[in-house]
Amino acid sequence: MELPEVLQDEQYYEGIGRRKRSSARVRIYPAVQGQPLFMVNDKDVREFFPRFGDYEILVGPLEDTDLLGRVAVTVLVEGGGITGQRDSVRLGIARALVKYDENLRGALRENGHLTRDPRVKERKKPGLKRARKAPTYTKR
């Protein structure tokens, strides 16, 4: 991912977020006038996550800490589906904000932004069609 020249030498705070099969590497920079504020995989956040409501979930940690518009966010996300990627980005943003300012931890924890969702796909068991689906039972 190529960063704009203005951001390349800047100090940044990094946070890693994961959810299901998705992993996101988030970097937070001080906002620079005229630069994009929220990029995901070199695209604008609304272009990468076009579904209704995704943007509000993603900027939740920034809104709860009153930093929306005051920091620039760049994200590299891979793996999983749209929802998993969205939630991994949100967790990465929250973790990066804690590195940015430790005093934000309470507000982020209170709103559930620092909690990693532990649910992952259950493995397929032998003798079953899927993790829990059994083959059709036949009496004869």
What positions do the PLM features span?
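Structured, basic alpha/beta domains of bacterial-type, RNA-associated proteins
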Residues: 2-20, 24, 28-29, 34-78, ...
